[in-house]
Amino acid sequence: MKLLIIEDEHDLNNALSKHLKKNGYGVDSCYNGMEALEYMQVTVYDAIILDIMMPIMDGYEFLTRIRSSNDQTPVLLLTARDSLQDKVSGLDSGADDYLVKPFEFEELLARIRVMTRRAYGQVSNEIRVDNLILDLAKKKVVRSGSEINLTSKEYEILEYLMKNKDHILTRQQIQDHVWDFDYEGASNLIDVLIKNIRKKIDLENSKPLIYTKRGLGYVIRNTEENQTDESDKND
């Protein structure tokens, strides 16, 4: 899951980034709304953590800008303002939730999970594709009752595929979603990680779930939907 932090307090920004990455999130961070708009031109985020009082462009103006362009990325306002009117103003500006500083990090994690569940139309922390289950809260993957151990990047890629079930994701989309804004790595890294994920989730006597669409990217589907055509492969 890819998050964008927009917070002008450098210490808090760094602490949030560190803790969120430790909990398995991909994170980009910036310090004002104008900079954030530039990030959003090249990366799609699952959720945004947004301060209100910032230089150059504050949180309210940033919210107005993205909502007027019909961007519905979930936004959590993170601010020291705790009056009822401040909360109402923030929510009316287009925020999905509001958390007052200081706060417990566990509450922030829970609110992020709730926001993203709503955005993806989920009613629980579990995502299912056939008999493969991914628990967003526990960062746990199970297939046919057997727990599967994934690296952090393998988990992030699988989560992204499962949240976009039946939709083809390009290698560039996967890279932008899982790695930091300025990442530059091996050109075949996505292919290598997908191959590793397949080896781990395709248990003995189980049918494959992740397919390659030649020239396009990858897609995850229920086994009964995997009537492959000449453009599909699982290698």
Model regions and ranges:
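N-terminal/domain-start alpha-helical segments
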Residues: 1-119, 235
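Residues at or immediately flanking beta-strands
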Residues: 2, 26, 74, 124-126, ...
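Short glycine- and Lys/Arg-enriched binding-loop motifs that mark or flank ligand-binding interfaces
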Residues: 29, 55, 86, 90, ...
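Short, Lys/Arg-enriched segments at the junction into DNA-binding effector domains
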Residues: 2, 113-168, 172, 222-223, ...
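Short, conserved catalytic or interaction motifs in soluble domains
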Residues: 68, 93, 120, 163, ...
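Positively charged, aromatic-enriched patches within helix-turn-helix-type DNA-binding elements
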Residues: 140-209, 214-216
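Glycine-rich nucleotide-binding loop
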Residues: 35, 215-219
